[in-house]
Amino acid sequence: VDSVLKEAENLIGNGVKEILLISQDTTYYGRDLSDERATLPELLRGLDKVGGDFWVRVLYTHPAHWSDELVEALAESKRAVKYVDMPLQHIDDWVLSKMRRETTEKKIRELLKKIRAGIPSVAVRTAFIAGFPGETPARFDRLMAFIEEAKFERLGIFSYSKEEGTQAYSMPGHVSARVKQSRFERAMELQQRIAAEVQRSRIGMRLRVLWDAPGVGRTEWDAPGVDGRVYGRGLEKAGTFSVATIEGSTDYDLIAKGGAIPKEDF
């Protein structure tokens, strides 16, 4: 923990405004160390004590390794953004077991309920794989129904890619490229509609924005490179925070008062 905190202090001292905590499974942090303080909740509490004006964003958490303590730590942290990045991959129990995800539909639903109840105004980002070997039409329909119901603020869809050396490579029931593409498109179309609804709900809000460049920033609900943007007037200084009034939206982005989307971004 101390080494991570020291690195964070150095970065913040050099003007960094957002600290990203990321690994293959960030929720597993510290479990392979002898230091009992080396847990993600303890790290978040330590970062709360670091001086400066900055955000902390936790990326790539695993649904099987969350704890009540982590939910509480994220809710109580004055530095951590209210943003949960948790790739679920699927919701069908059979597919989850073949993926070795160590979780079930019931556990996922319970965890999401706990996160949303425990962290007010949280945005949840997830990712799903369409066309995994053995994904029947019924299993895909179950995934689609779950996406419709859960209404994730941020969501990515990936078509299964056959990779030699993986367990799934030799599994029976591989889905054709045509069907995988069709399922990918259907899921993306559904999420695009949901995302547009989420963004419209932000109109009228006054939100804190981190400006990555003049006129281009992000809310706490947007990770760099993968989520939406806030478009401002172009007078904002890169690497600063300000509060912006949201006056418009697109499917994935927000438009602040006096802002406009650059032509090259259409």
Question: Where do the language-model regions lie?
Answer:
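Conserved SAM/SAH cofactor-binding pocket of Class I
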Residues: 2, 6-16
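Conserved, mostly hydrophobic/aromatic
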Residues: 4, 21, 58, 86, ...
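Aromatic/hydrophobic pocket-lining residues that form the small-molecule binding cavity
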Residues: 4, 40, 108, 140-143, ...
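Conserved SAM/AdoMet-binding glycine-rich loop
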Residues: 12-138, 148
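Active-site proximal loops enriched in glycine and acidic residues that flank catalytic Cys/His/Asp
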Residues: 23, 60-62, 88-90, 126-130, ...
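C-terminal, non-catalytic macromolecule-binding modules
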Residues: 118, 138, 142-181, 187
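Terminal RNA-binding accessory module
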Residues: 170-266
